[in-house]
Structure formats: C-alpha cells, structure tokens
Design a protein with these regions (language model features):
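Extracellular beta-strand-rich recognition modules
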Residues: 96-106, 141-145, 155-162
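Short beta-strand/loop motifs in extracellular/secreted proteins, especially
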Residues: 113-117, 155
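Glycine-rich strand-loop-strand elements at beta-sheet edges
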Residues: 118-152
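A short pocket-lining beta-strand/turn micro-motif at the edge of beta-sheets
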Residues: 152-157, 178
Length: 188
C-alpha cells in the first residue's frame, strides 16, 4: 500500500473488437441514443405484417335478407400475399391477433330498415353490427372494426353484408368507402 497507480491514455481506435469480450457488453452499457432501427439487424424489429387492403373493382348487389360475401377483388397492397382475390378471404397463416376493418357504401334509397356488416372467421360470425338506415339517404356507409384472434395457421377471415329492404340493393365500389383490410398487432 502507499503506492500510487498511474493510468495511461488509450489512443482513439486503439481498442478493437478483438480486445472486447462479448460477455462484458450489456445493453445497460449502450446509450439509448446509440441504438437506432438502422443499426439493428434486419428482422429484429417487430412489424404489423401480414397486412392487406382490398377494394372492389365493380358494384355488387346485396339480396334481401341474405348474408352476402363481398367481392373485394382488387388489392391496394398485400405485404405477404395472404389475401386471396379469387375467394375474397384473408388467411394470415401467422398466429396472432389482427385488427380488421370492413366498410361498404350501400346505395339504398328510402326503403331499408336495417343493414348488417359482419366479419366471419372460418365461416362463423365473430364480429357483427346491425345499423338502422337513415331514411332518405341515397347512399350510406356501414363499417365494423375489431380484433380477431387467429389461433391456427389455417384460420381465415371474410366480410359479409346484409340488408332488409325487400329488394336487391347495390354496394358501390369506391376505394375510400367500400374496403376490407387487416394487419397483425405487434406483441399481441
């Protein structure tokens, strides 16, 4: 004891990766500001995929009191090719919870009492709402959104509409009012 210990300066760049033992580096020793998504390895950050947004290429008729699957046959985007435009079905094949939205613009006139919009998983209703039609409106939008749990890689989701006017009514094809979309929730 009684001896002084001196320190020497290490030149900038004097310590390379070969001198650092991986076990000595912890995330607590790395400043938060030094960690950016650009510096992380590809695939390390979670994403909201698979995801899709589909619309209709033309109007579609809804028969009276008949649940009808909507023909969303045009993809605006489909990150993982999980939406099928031939059967109008989203099969994510990745287990998880999905935020799903379905909207339709119905050209109805004054004769509709109620309209239902439904989201079905594997052929059964999982989300459904019945909305009264506002008499006198020539067109009205109907929408449903919610979280659907896909617990199996074969689970699929479809969008259905129904109306009770006593006659056939058209769903109007518009990108902003008649659409079907979904994305996986991160961490769910």
């Amino acid at each position: 004891l009684g001896k002084s210990v001196g320190t020497i300066g290490v030149p900038v760049g004097g310590v390379g990766t070969s001198q650092i033992i991986d076990a000595n580096i912890t995330t607590a020793k790395i400043a938060d500001s030094a960690v950016t998504s650009a510096k992380l390895a590809s695939g390390l950050l979670p994403t909201n995929t698979p995801a899709f947004y589909a619309t209709m290429s033309g109007n579609q008729n809804l028969s009276n009191n008949t649940a009808t699957k909507l023909n969303f046959d045009t993809e605006v985007f489909d990150t993982d090719s999980k939406y099928d435009t031939s059967n109008f079905r989203f099969t994510p094949s990745t287990v998880g919870k999905y935020f799903v939205t379905f909207s339709m613009l119905l050209s109805s006139g004054a004769s509709i009492g109620a309209v239902q919009v439904k989201l079905r998983k594997n052929g059964s209703d999982v989300l459904k709402t019945t909305q009264a039609h506002f008499y006198g409106n020539a067109q009205q939008s109907y929408m449903i959104s919610g979280i659907i749990n896909c617990a199996s890689s074969s689970d699929y989701i479809e969008a259905f509409g129904e109306q009770d006017s006593g006659s056939t009514k058209p769903v109007i094809a518009t990108v902003t009012s008649s659409f079907f979309q979904a994305y996986k929730l991160i961490g769910a």
